[in-house]
Amino acid sequence: MKILGIDPGSRNCGYAIIEANKGKNILIEAGLIKIKPNTLQYQITELCEGLDLIFKNHSFDEVAIEDIFFAYNPKTVLKLAQFRGALSLKILQIHGDFAEYTPLQVKKAVTGKAKATKEQVAFMVKRLLGLSKDIKPLDITDAIAVALTHAANLRVRV
């Protein structure tokens, strides 16, 4: 089963594609949709065009996205919510339904601790996939963690 995991952001959007089969997960591709500083409308367009490219190059059985985290700055929350809304609409138009996980759910699924640091998540992602190299930046490891969380959740539901 091919799963796309997405870690939305207003500067970079991490994405990861894994193949999940009988409890074994293989990383197919991971990267960033880089969003250049510009007006919000152009940034959202850039994000959606990046997602379009991913869907043009791959087909997916499942898509999972990390929910936005709580931020203290209301402007940040509003901007992230707009990016998240655009991503949600684009995924629904191209693929259909998708799963959503909070950052705490992702951290708990990957590390066993809901309050794990991004570095701890990155360490466990590397370990769970049997990778020899570190994956940078952390937006990418977060996207992989979202995909792994969804794969684990699907195994539990089956």
Swiss-Prot record:
Q: Name the positions where Mg(2+) 2 binds.
A: E66
The cofactor required is:
Mg(2+)
Which PROSITE patterns does the UniProt record give?
RUVC (PS01321)
Q: What is its EC number?
A: 3.1.21.10
Which cellular component terms (GO) are annotated to the entry?
A: cytoplasm; Holliday junction resolvase complex
Q: Give me the comment on cofactor binding.
A: Binds 2 Mg(2+) ion per subunit.
At which positions is Mg(2+) 1 bound? D7, D139
Among the GO molecular function terms of this UniProt record, one is:
magnesium ion binding
Q: State the reactions this protein catalyses.
A: Endonucleolytic cleavage at a junction such as a reciprocal single-stranded crossover between two homologous DNA duplexes (Holliday junction)
Which residues act catalytically here? D7, E66, D139
**Pfam families from the entry?**
RuvC
**InterPro entries, alphabetically?**
RNaseH-like_sf, RNaseH_sf, X-over_junc_endoDNase_Mg_BS, X-over_junc_endoDNase_RuvC
Q: Describe its partners and assembly state.
A: Homodimer which binds Holliday junction (HJ) DNA. The HJ becomes 2-fold symmetrical on binding to RuvC with unstacked arms; it has a different conformation from HJ DNA in complex with RuvA. In the full resolvosome a probable DNA-RuvA(4)-RuvB(12)-RuvC(2) complex forms which resolves the HJ.
Q: What does this protein do?
A: The RuvA-RuvB-RuvC complex processes Holliday junction (HJ) DNA during genetic recombination and DNA repair. Endonuclease that resolves HJ intermediates. Cleaves cruciform DNA by making single-stranded nicks across the HJ at symmetrical positions within the homologous arms, yielding a 5'-phosphate and a 3'-hydroxyl group; requires a central core of homology in the junction. The consensus cleavage sequence is 5'-(A/T)TT(C/G)-3'. Cleavage occurs on the 3'-side of the TT dinucleotide at the point of strand exchange.
| UniProt record similarity statement | Belongs to the RuvC family.
What HAMAP family does this protein's entry cite? RuvC
Protein name as it appears in the record: Crossover junction endodeoxyribonuclease RuvC
**The organism of origin for this protein:** Campylobacter jejuni subsp. jejuni serotype O:6 (strain 81116 / NCTC 11828)
Q: What is the lineage of its organism?
A: Bacteria, Pseudomonadati, Campylobacterota, Epsilonproteobacteria, Campylobacterales
Q: Gene symbol?
A: ruvC
